[in-house]
Amino acid sequence: AINSESGVRSVVPQPCNALPNQGPEK
């Protein structure tokens, strides 16, 4: 993994990306 956000985003598609209503899920 490169970065916390990049790594997680790359491996697991964050719902925040599809649903901006939830926002950044950390």
Swiss-Prot record:
Residues 1-26 are annotated as: Disordered. It comes from the Eukaryota. This is Unknown protein 16.
